[in-house]
Every structure is written in structure tokens, then in C-alpha cells.
């Protein structure tokens, strides 16, 4: 192996002799060499830190008081996309801020999508993922809609696995919560006019979380929004683009200021049909029939949503995906919400046009039955007969 100093000396001498070579080219080559050397050292350092940290529980951590707030962990997974549209080998980096051009497409034109999945700890300490491949498929669908290249499903799942393993000490004990993993795909290349970015970055970071809503497992209080809408036909409501969530903030803030847990949006055309909440899907129960709004292009086809549809049918319920008028919603026996962040959450009341209606909740409710089955599968307590669980350790 050539000594680093001798290699640089020979490189400089060769460029001094060659008159056709520019100093900028020399700088780029030396910079690349220094960068690759630093990268190797950094990777070695991170590997050492990873092996030391991975099994050491964070100090002063009260797992019983976890909410749904960002708690930075140790590592972030990063993967760059070349100009040819191929994603390079990803790597783990220490958690920290990232640098972006002020002209990055994600900042100027919102060219970005994200996913959400969770890692759970079994009683024996091993880690489980719940259907991460479905999140990978959905990211690819979203990327196509947003004119972005996307990692393959295998690359996506591998990134989630690596993120979970690297941050395993932050996975709460069984029954205390989960490690929420946020994969993010964004146009990081600089553009001035409206156009797809020239470069893209995939990231995955993690945070230990408990219940999404401040109510914990208590029934939710929802407010039906009939002024603002979340999505419109032909738009991006069916993908997890970042703009879908920022447009919910005004309505959500208004509802929370009135003491509600979340806001329920109606369709943008008729202002009559139920769509979804700011962060999750909705179901209604009437006897042995369960209904949820059809995924027709304006709502997100949630991974938890599709799982609950299967679980409900396994429990003998008839499940329909169809249009649900808000008047029918208000006459339901039971209402509940589903999502990766929220799990399965029962709805205690809904307010629409100053009319408040209460719904069945409690240990005998349908939603509680589904919640117990779902969380049981996710944590390894209930047998997974569907191949949904990926055990990674």
C-alpha cells in the first residue's frame, strides 16, 4: 500500500508536469482522496461506537412517560441517489443536522415524501418490525407521483433494519412503547425553476415513542372540518408527500385550541363524505359491518388500515371500503382510527355543526378487540399467521 503522503506527493508532481491539467481538477482529486480517507476513519469510529452503545440503555430514561415527541437517538441512515437515478450504498451516520442548498427542491417546491414504521421489543429482548415492505412499496408509489427516484423495496427494508439495530438501545422494553422510524426521501439538489431535483437523498431516523395522542389510550374527541380540506381529486392525497400534512395545520390547530384531539376532513367536492384525520384513517362500526372510506386517490392507504381490514374479517366482520356520508358517521355505533403512529384508537365523541355525538368505547368495544390483536402480533405475543413480522435480532 502506498503511504498517504507519498501518494499525494506523486499526484501533485504529475499534475505539475502535465500542462493540460487544471488546478481545479487537482483540487477535486485531492479532496476526493481526503474525503474517502476521512470516510473510512469515520466508518471505523462509528462501528466502534455502535458496538459500544447498542446494548447500553439510555441513562435517566423513564419509559413510562414516553409521548410522541422527538427524542434524538444515536444514528441516522443515509443514502444518496446518483445523477443516473441509482441509489448508492447507504451508511449509518451519527445523528445530527444536515446541510441543504437554499435552492433545494424539497425546500422550494416541497419535493419530498416520508414513511413511518416501528420497531418493537419482544419479551426476550429481540426486535421486531411490522410489515416494513409495505411502507417500501408505498414510498415507491409516492416517489413516482412526485417525479422522484426511489430505493427498491429491499433497500428500503434494509435501511429500516439497520436504523433499528443501530439504535436498539432506544427501543423501549416490551409493553412500554416502540421505536418510531421515519424514512424520508427528498430532492436535495438545487433548482431555481419548477423542475425535479437533480439529486436526491434518502434518510431514516428514529425516536422512541409512546402514545400519539395526549389522551393516551383514552377515547378521542374529534371535530369535523367543513371549511378546509386535506386533499382533492387528482392531487396527492394518496401519497405521504410532506405538503399533505402542512395543509392540515390550520384546521388541526383550530380544533386543538377548542379542546379536540384531532380534526376529521370531508371530501373537497361535496363537503359531505368522510375522508380521514390529519394523521390516520377512520372506521365506523354498525352491527357486524365495518366500513372505511375507499382509497380512491384522496386518502392514504394506510398499512395499519389494510391490516385491520384483514383482522376484522378474521374476526367474522363484514368489511366494506366505500363512501361514507358524514350523517351516516354520526349515526354509527362505534368509531375508531388507525395508523402507524396511533395504532388503533377509539373515538369517544365527534362534533359536527355544533352537534356532539358519543360512541361506544371500553373493554368490550370492537376497537379494543382489534387493538389487542394488532399490538399482540406486533410485539410477538400473538402468533403471526400472515407473515407480517420481520424479526431482525
From Swiss-Prot:
Q: What is its EC number?
A: 2.6.1.42
Residue stretches in coiled coil: none
InterPro entries, per this entry? Aminotrans_IV, Aminotrans_IV_CS, Aminotransferase-like, B_amino_transII, BCAT-like_C, BCAT-like_N, BCAT_family
Please give the SUPFAM superfamilies that the UniProt record associates with this protein: D-aminoacid aminotransferase-like PLP-dependent enzymes (SSF56752)
PROSITE patterns referenced in this protein's UniProt entry, alphabetically:
AA_TRANSFER_CLASS_4
* Residues that bear N6-(pyridoxal phosphate)lysine: 240
Q: Which residues bind pyridoxal 5'-phosphate?
A: 138, 276
Record GO cellular component, one term: mitochondrion
Q: Which domain of life is it from?
A: Eukaryota
Under catalytic activity, the entry for this protein gives: L-isoleucine + 2-oxoglutarate = (S)-3-methyl-2-oxopentanoate + L-glutamate; L-leucine + 2-oxoglutarate = 4-methyl-2-oxopentanoate + L-glutamate; L-valine + 2-oxoglutarate = 3-methyl-2-oxobutanoate + L-glutamate
Q: In which pathway does it act?
A: Amino-acid biosynthesis; L-isoleucine biosynthesis; L-isoleucine from 2-oxobutanoate: step 4/4; Amino-acid biosynthesis; L-leucine biosynthesis; L-leucine from 3-methyl-2-oxobutanoate: step 4/4; Amino-acid biosynthesis; L-valine biosynthesis; L-valine from pyruvate: step 4/4
Q: Which GO terms describe its molecular function?
A: L-isoleucine-2-oxoglutarate transaminase activity; L-leucine-2-oxoglutarate transaminase activity; L-valine-2-oxoglutarate transaminase activity
Its annotated compartments are: Mitochondrion
Family in the record: Belongs to the class-IV pyridoxal-phosphate-dependent aminotransferase family.
What biological function has been recorded for the protein in this entry?
Converts 2-oxo acids to branched-chain amino acids (BCAA). Shows no kinetic preferences corresponding to anabolic or catabolic functions, but likely involved in BCAA catabolism.
Task: Cite the NCBIfam families for this sequence.
Answer: ilvE_II (TIGR01123), PRK13357.1 (NF009897)
Query: How is this protein named in the record?
Result: Branched-chain amino acid aminotransferase 1, mitochondrial
* Organism for this UniProt entry: Humulus lupulus (European hop)
- In the UniProt record, what gene is named as encoding this protein? BCAT1
Amino acid at each position: 500500500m502506498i503511504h498517504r503522503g507519498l501518494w499525494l506527493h506523486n499526484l501533485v508532481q504529475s499534475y505539475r508536469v502535465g500542462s493540460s491539467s487544471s488546478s481545479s481538477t487537482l483540487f477535486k482529486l485531492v479532496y476526493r482522496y481526503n474525503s474517502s480517507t476521512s470516510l473510512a476513519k469515520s466508518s471505523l469510529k462509528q462501528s466502534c461506537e455502535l458496538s459500544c452503545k447498542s446494548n447500553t440503555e439510555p441513562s435517566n430514561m423513564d419509559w413510562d412517560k414516553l409521548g410522541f415527541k422527538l427524542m434524538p437517538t444515536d444514528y441516522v441512515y443515509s443514502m444518496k441517489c446518483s445523477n443516473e437515478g441509482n441509489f448508492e450504498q447507504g451508511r449509518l451516520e451519527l445523528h445530527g443536522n444536515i446541510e441543504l442548498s437554499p435552492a433545494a427542491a424539497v425546500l422550494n417546491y416541497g419535493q419530498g415524501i416520508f414513511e413511518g414504521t416501528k420497531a418493537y421489543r419482544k419479551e426476550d429482548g429481540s426486535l421486531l418490525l411490522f410489515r416494513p415492505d409495505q411502507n417500501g412499496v408505498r414510498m415507491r408509489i409516492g416517489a413516482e407521483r412526485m417525479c422522484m427516484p426511489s430505493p427498491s423495496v429491499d433497500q428500503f427494508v434494509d435501511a429500516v433494519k439497520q436504523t433499528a439495530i443501530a439504535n436498539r438501545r432506544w427501543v423501549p422494553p416490551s409493553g412500554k412503547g416502540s421505536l418510531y422510524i421515519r424514512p424520508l426521501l427528498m430532492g436535495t439538489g438545487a433548482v431555481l425553476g419548477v423542475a425535479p431535483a437533480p439529486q436526491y437523498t434518502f434518510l431514516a431516523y428514529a425516536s422512541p415513542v409512546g402514545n400519539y395522542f395526549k389522551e393516551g389510550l383514552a377515547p378521542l374527541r374529534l371535530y369535523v372540518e367543513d371549511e378546509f380540506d386535506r386533499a382533492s381529486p387528482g392531487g396527492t392525497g394518496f401519497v405521504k408527500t410532506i405538503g399533505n400534512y402542512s395543509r392540515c395545520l390550520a384546521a388541526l390547530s383550530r380544533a386543538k385550541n377548542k379542546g379536540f384531539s384531532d380534526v376529521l376532513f370531508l371530501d373537497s367536492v361535496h363537503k359531505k363524505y368522510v375522508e380521514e384525520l390529519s394523521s390516520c384513517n377512520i372506521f365506523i362500526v354498525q352491527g357486524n359491518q365495518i366500513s372505511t372510506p375507499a382509497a380512491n386517490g384522496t386518502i392514504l392507504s394506510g398499512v395499519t388500515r389494510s391490516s385491520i381490514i384483514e383482522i376484522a374479517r378474521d374476526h367474522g366482520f363484514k368489511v366494506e371500503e366505500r363512501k361514507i356520508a358524514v350523517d351516516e358517521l354520526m349515526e354509527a355505533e362505534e368509531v375508531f382510527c388507525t395508523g402507524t403512529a396511533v395504532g388503533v384508537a377509539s373515538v369517544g365523541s365527534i362534533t359536527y355543526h355544533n352537534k356532539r355525538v358519543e360512541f361506544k368505547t371500553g373493554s368490550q368495544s370492537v376497537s379494543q378487540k382489534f387493538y389487542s390483536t394488532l399490538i399482540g402480533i406486533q410485539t410477538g405475543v400473538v402468533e403471526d399467521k400472515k407473515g407480517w413480522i420481520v424479526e431482525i435480532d
